[in-house]
Swiss-Prot record:
PANTHER family, alphabetized: PHOSPHOENOLPYRUVATE CARBOXYKINASE, PHOSPHOENOLPYRUVATE CARBOXYKINASE [GTP]-RELATED
A Pfam family of this chain: PEPCK_N
Catalytic activity field: oxaloacetate + GTP = phosphoenolpyruvate + GDP + CO2
Protein name: Phosphoenolpyruvate carboxykinase [GTP]
Annotated function: Catalyzes the conversion of oxaloacetate (OAA) to phosphoenolpyruvate (PEP), the rate-limiting step in the metabolic pathway that produces glucose from lactate and other precursors derived from the citric acid cycle.
Alphabetized CDD domains for the sequence: PEPCK_GTP
One biological process term in Gene Ontology: response to starvation
GO molecular-function terms, A-Z: GTP binding; manganese ion binding; phosphoenolpyruvate carboxykinase (GTP) activity
Lineage per the UniProt record: Bacteria, Bacillati, Actinomycetota, Actinomycetes, Mycobacteriales
Pathway(s) where this gene product acts: Carbohydrate biosynthesis; gluconeogenesis
Gene name of the encoded protein: pckG
Sites where the protein binds substrate: R82, Y221, G222, G223, S272, N388, S389, R390
GO cellular component: cytosol
Enzyme Commission code: 4.1.1.32
């Protein structure tokens, strides 16, 4: 196929990959865009797109002195978060999607979406965005190409992925790639005026696991539209991982170095908005300890030649929740944004062209423009920034970025943490007995709801196995089987699994543990447990730290609060048993025998504790 066969293509196609060119030509015929542009990932391209989006009213250029080369986008109020009810796993067999996913027959879904896609890019530019998951130097890279009519998405992907010419070169003339289609679903007829944030009330976020395709329609927001993020890095990658013998997980990756210079690496799975980014960017309060971030959201875990599990961050940027981020809770995130080059979405705008959100340092300004574009004062009875408002910034700007984030081999994982928001029941930190016990603990992870999903009822408890509930690309029971299989393969070289809970509350509702930088004290105990240097108390859930096992020097939290935070009350665990049993039943017949056996053992421990 020649370049001429792609109507509207600007200039020559920078590739001879016939499969790619044919696919683009088919997409042009379907979407009917006005122009087709290959994104090259250059600074010139970023600057040009930014200027165009400022002119269109999609972006607001922020104060150049305070936020150089940074922009604010305000989305349509109907398009502010992931939409789980419109997210589909379209496997050939419904059973392969399992009980936790919405399923539709792939052929029927493709026919349905083809109709909404038809002509959906009229009057718009279709961008061809080649990207690489993880470091571009990987000899066996996972590649993708997204076709999108959103320049905001292209700008976001330049931050979030290794995108552009280098990725296209990596695909080469016959390389394989995951095909990602995205349209905001807002065609422009001739003479029709555009809106600042085009989207459609009808939304689809669809994954096809057998063919490794992603089709998205109707949303311009984050994870619905930046298809390299949750759609590829977790939903499609988890399917690849099961087929190829690795794991794609919703985990941060943290490098910790002790005063002796020994480095350790921790991967941690928490549900969205439960503190992954804060932990990934932790500033340890214990003297002599150093923390560096490898990733804050997604980890791909693979065995290397030495038989150990290594973690790679497939992303290149942070897409962090803004509200609550400040110089006390997460100084590293704030410092990462200081050099600029940041895309903000749905935060508030100050009168001098800076940004603001709830929980930022200092008092709220006397006047703001809120995320909907309206005047706001401290007397206003609604938040100035949307609870799920975001900042998007490159990892390389982070002052504590570990150099290993650019190493395709990744880092050896010494410990895995699971954790959510539980006001009671779950102690501050516990080591599980072994990999199978840890898998069961992860399978029964439950947390309070957050605003990261558009449909969440905030505060209610929801089960979230391994923090992967919205992101498993296949049957949840088979996903847990992959955990068991990985443990069997790795044997005694597998990392230890721990359960943490920063959010225990006292009877009066106060937090019992100060959290944030003080969590380094818990991480030190985790490392000391791995090295066999510190004790623990056996509780119903595992080996739980005692107050005297933690390094509490210089901490002014009452010792009684810490002791209470470390309890694992058998009666509270007993109260969860029925709910947990029902949940394992809900997950279906493919849940591994080992998980059921571990749950039965937990029940026996709880009954024995209650009897004594």
């Amino acid at each position: 196929m020649t370049t001429a066969a792609i109507p509207g293509l600007q200039g020559e196609a920078p590739t001879n990959n016939q499969e790619l060119l044919n696919w683009i030509a088919e997409a042009v015929e379907l979407f009917q865009p006005e122009a087709v542009v290959f994104a090259d990932g250059s600074q010139e391209e970023w600057d040009r797109m930014a200027e165009e989006l400022v002119e269109a009213g999609t972006l607001i250029r922020l104060n150049e002195e305070k936020r150089p080369n940074s922009f604010l986008a305000r989305s349509n109020p109907s398009d502010v978060a992931r939409v789980e009810s419109r997210t589909f796993i379209c496997s050939e067999n419904q059973e392969d999607a399992g009980p936790t996913n919405n399923w539709a027959p792939p052929q029927a879904m493709k026919e349905e979406m083809t109709e909404v896609y038809r002509g959906s890019m009229k009057g718009r530019t279709m961008y061809v965005v080649p990207f690489c998951m993880g470091p571009i130097t990987d000899p066996e890279p996972k590649l993708g190409v997204q076709l999108t009519d959103s320049a905001y998405v292209v700008m976001s992907m330049r931050i979030m992925t290794r995108m552009g010419k280098d990725a296209l070169d990596k695909i080469g003339e016959n390389g394989s790639f995951v095909r990602c289609l995205h349209s905001v679903g807002a065609p422009l007829e001739e003479g029709q005026e555009d809106v600042a944030w085009p989207c459609n009330d009808t939304k689809y976020i669809t994954q096809f696991p057998e063919t490794k395709e992603i089709w998205s329609y109707g949303s311009g927001y984050g994870g619905n539209a930046i298809l390299a993020k949750k759609c590829y890095a977790l939903r499609i990658a988890s399917v690849m991982a099961r087929e190829e013998g690795w794991m794609a997980e919703h985990m941060l990756i943290l490098k910790l170095t002790n005063p002796e210079g020994q480095a350790y690496h921790i991967a941690a799975a928490f549900p969205s908005a439960c503190g992954k980014t804060n932990l990934a960017m932790i500033t340890p309060t214990i003297p002599g300890w150093k923390a560096e971030v490898v990733g804050d959201d997604i980890a791909w875990l693979k065995f290397r030649e030495d038989g150990h599990l290594y973690a790679v961050n497939p992303e290149n940027g942070f897409f962090g929740v803004a509200p609550g981020t400040n110089y006390a809770s997460n100084p590293i995130a704030m410092q990462t944004m200081e050099p600029g080059n940041t895309l903000f979405t749905n935060v508030a705008l100050t009168d001098d062209g800076d940004i603001w959100w709830e929980g930022m340092d200092g008092d709220a300004p006397e006047h703001l423009i809120d995320w909907k574009g309206n005047d706001w004062t401290p007397e206003s009875n609604q938040p100035a920034a949307h609870p799920n408002s975001r900042y998007c910034v490159a990892i390389e700007q982070c002052p504590t970025a570990a150099p290993e984030f650019n190493d395709w081999k990744g880092v050896k994982v010494d410990a895995i943490l699971f954790g959510g928001r539980r006001p009671d029941t779950v102690p501050l930190v516990t080591q599980t007995h072994d990999w199978e016990h840890g898998t069961m603990v992860g399978a029964l992870l439950a947390s309070g709801q957050t605003a990261a999903s558009a449909e969440a009822k905030v505060g209610t408890l929801r089960h979230d196995p391994m923090a992967m509930l919205p992101f498993m690309g296949y049957n949840a029971g088979e996903y847990l089987q992959n955990w068991i299989d990985m443990g069997n393969k790795g044997g005694d070289k597998m990392p230890s699994i721990f359960l943490v809970n920063w959010f225990r509350r006292g009877e009066d509702g106060r937090f019992l543990w100060p959290g944030f930088g003080e969590n380094s004290r818990v991480l030190k105990w985790v490392i000391d447990r791995i090295e066999g240097r510190v004790g623990a108390e056996e509780t119903v859930v595992g080996y739980t730290a005692r107050a005297e096992d933690l390094d509490l020097e210089g901490l002014d939290t009452p010792i009684e609060d810490i002791r209470e935070a470390l309890t694992a009350p058998a009666e509270q665990w007993a109260a969860d048993l029925e709910d947990n049993a029902e949940y394992l039943t809900f997950l279906g017949p493919k849940v591994p025998t080992e998980v059921h056996e571990q749950f039965e053992a937990l029940k026996k421990r709880i009954q024995a504790a209650q009897a004594s």
